Amino acid sequence: IAGYGLSVSAPAQAYVQAHLADPAFRRWRAMGLVRGADLPWYGRDDAQVAWPGPAPLLASAIATGPSENTMCPYSGDPVTDFLSLDGRTFGFCNAFCRDKTQADPLVWPAFAALR
């Protein structure tokens, strides 16, 4: 429904929007964007629409630090990969931790606590 912009009733659309706004769903989506595969059995010939959920903050992966934090907010390990957000630099223990955060920064409580 959401990914293809399919028309549904107002109550059904409200149900979809509630799911798209749910932080747990958004974390799952972020990880899928980073490491997930497109599963062909879910594909349709219809044109897809842009992400219809809440707009995530724009962040970008950068090659070097230093970062404001020395330990990854998720694992507690030393940082090796970096992200820029709002002119600030944050570090992560690996590219996956950085990239899932880049996809939707504020849905990750451990990262949001750094801001």
Language-model segments: residues:
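C-terminal alpha-helical interaction module
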Residues: 1-68, 83, 99
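A conserved hydrophobic position in a structured secondary element of the catalytic/binding core
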Residues: 20, 92-93, 103
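Residues immediately within or flanking Cys/His clusters that coordinate Zn2+
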Residues: 69, 87-90
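Short cysteine-rich clusters marking metal-coordination/redox-active sites
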Residues: 72-74, 83-85
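Cys/His/Pro-rich metal-binding microdomains
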Residues: 73, 91, 95
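Cys/His-rich microdomains that often coordinate metals
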Residues: 78-79, 101
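Short metal-binding segments enriched for Cys and/or His
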Residues: 97-114
